[in-house]
């Protein structure tokens, strides 16, 4: 199985999410009252393997590649907005932009919904 360029990029972003999740967890362990950082770290760590799984399912033909890529992209966009807003609020005491966290949350939910479609919509058979 060979990964397409977009799949490699999505997998790399999943790895970055995992790395940032570990870094935020470590930072939050040393900052009293860093609940928002703990939440951001958990979201990053929980979603990184899901993104990798979606990339793998799509690339292997177990799911429709297009649906898997959309789901992974929505999860990544959601993480950027949700975790980014929580982190900016914690470190700089202002919002990323108005409604960034809720928008990110909706993108995460949409990503999971498309992930459900990946499971329910049969993959195309090879010709």
Predicted regions and their residues:
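Hydrophobic alpha-helical transmembrane segments of polytopic
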Residues: 10, 14-18, 71-78, 104, ...
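Non-cytosolic membrane-interface motifs at loop->transmembrane helix junctions
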Residues: 35-42, 95-106
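Core segments of alpha-helical transmembrane spans in multipass integral membrane proteins
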Residues: 16-24, 36-63, 73-84
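Membrane-helix boundary connector in multi-pass membrane proteins
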Residues: 85-100, 118
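Short, charged juxtamembrane terminal tails flanking transmembrane helices
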Residues: 1-2, 122-127
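Hydrophobic cores of alpha-helical transmembrane segments in multi-pass inner/ER membrane proteins
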Residues: 46-56, 107-118
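Helix-loop junctions at the membrane-solvent interface of multi-pass transporters
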Residues: 27-31, 54, 61, 91-92, ...
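N-terminal signal-anchor transmembrane alpha helix
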Residues: 6-30
């Amino acid at each position: 199985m060979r990964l397409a360029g977009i799949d490699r990029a999505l997998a790399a972003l999943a790895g970055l999410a995992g790395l940032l999740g570990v870094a935020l967890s470590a930072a939050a362990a040393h900052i009293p009252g860093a609940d928002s950082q703990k939440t951001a770290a958990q979201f990053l760590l929980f979603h990184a393997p899901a993104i990798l799984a979606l990339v793998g399912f799509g690339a292997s033909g177990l799911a429709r590649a297009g649906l898997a890529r959309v789901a992974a992209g929505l999860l990544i966009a959601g993480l950027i907005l949700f975790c980014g807003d929580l982190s900016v609020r914690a470190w700089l005491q202002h919002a990323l932009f108005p409604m960034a966290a809720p928008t990110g949350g909706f993108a995460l939910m949409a990503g999971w919904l498309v992930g459900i479609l990946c499971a329910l919509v049969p993959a195309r058979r090879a010709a």
